[in-house]
Amino acid sequence: EHGKLYMLQTRNGKRTAAAALKIAVDLVDEGKITEKDAVLRVEPKQLDSLLHPQFDAKALKAATPIGKGLAASPGAACGRIVFTAEDAKEWANKGEKVILVRLETSPEDIEGMSAAQGILTVRGGMTSHAAVVARGMGTCCVSGCGEITVDYEAKQFTLGGKAYHEG
């Protein structure tokens, strides 16, 4: 008004990690900010999300969660359910993507954990064996999903009254 600019309202701009990184790189390329400033503009947690697989945002909105656990290691995974490290290795060697489902993991499960796209445990927290090993390997892990009942003999787990079988 009359040559003056008035700010009526401001809001924080929300953007994805990829967008934040692109903006920072573009600003450096244009000479508007230094590389040091660009690094400071991208949150470390945002970078972490760029290093791991993610589900498509639209697919995620349309999905119905079946249970809850701790996001012990970031990422997204899909595959066939397996219940032993040996089965995880065997199926992975055949070219199948697998999710290793265990009550909890132990050092004996390491080869199966390595073969799996993701790990799901009934017990455990952020410092559990599954969580620590999965983070170290860059594998997605949900731990502490206590609503699950695992039946190794039947090769299935039950959650919310529904059974999920191996494969």
Predicted regions and their residues:
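Generic hydrophobic-segment detector
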Residues: 14, 21, 65, 69, ...
